[in-house]
Amino acid sequence: MHADGNNPGIRAGMEMLGRPLDKGLSAFMEDLLQRGMLDDTLIIVTGDFGRTPKINSRGGRDHWTRLCTLAFFGGGIGRGQIIGQSDRTNSTPNGSSVSTGNLLATVMHTLFDVGQLRLDSSVPNQLLATIQRDAPIVAL
């Protein structure tokens, strides 16, 4: 969506990627709900970076590491929440921010008994260190 030779601008990109994502996630969520599996399945939608607050000269947005959007559903977490905010230019977090460590800790604490994971020798040490160092996103 940064509109270079290989990527469309925002309007075309949202049409090409946004609609199928919305349709697929909506159908998946509805299927999990109908099967009674939504509270046991945590879905997280994110990317590996955000996009610049301003549209560039080619009609797109470049990579931006200071801020990105996460969407959570299922897993027994609260619904209809907005957690955190950006500054008025949408360029940096305003107040506390959520790290990738917080995201990983949230997943692990939501889906597993973390005390039992600490006893499992097959769990990588780096993962255990992250779980011990970073707190889950409490507001969820």
Language-model-detected regions and their locations in the chain:
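Ligand-binding pockets and gating/stacking loops
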Residues: 1-140
